[in-house]
Amino acid sequence: MLFRSVIYRSFVTNSYTNIASNGSFNALVNSGIIHPTAVLICPFIGATPNVGFGDFQWKSPFDTCPATMSPLSLTNLQVGIGGQNVLNSTLNMTYENFLQQVNLAEQLTSSDFGVSTGLISQSYWEMSKWYFVNVERGILADKLQPRNINVSFTNNSNVPIDVIIFTFYSDQLTIDVETGIVTK
């Protein structure tokens, strides 16, 4: 029999609403994810009546969101995989930190560019912040075990926020070339 393996990336989303101004956020975002590769945190202005939208920012026809974000600040950022912190210390993310995290995303070899080809400038990132953490470190045996993903941060903005957290992970399927049967 002749088999071919297909490795692909998929993602899971979670949304959290009404994180107070200067409030802390700490949550188990996903449980049992095998081979997580990245966590993307997208903050939006909260849907509370005090802010004026009355609905989610990303649903408003008068806002360019989600194509662009708001310059919302998250401090003391930390992502934990299986009880181990990914970042050496809690992070007050700057554009340089963002580039360090994004630099290895989708990079197959050391000569690949990945996604760090300069399409996201510093001024664009500062006015449209999202927070990317590359979690693809570790040995293969650890990656193949189900892991819990924890995210914590402080909302350093003057308004309540909502966040959507994307958890990216690698998955694999096998195709029997002779019969066309696909197995996971």
Q: Where do the language-model regions lie?
A:
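Flexible assembly/topogenesis modules
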Residues: 1-184
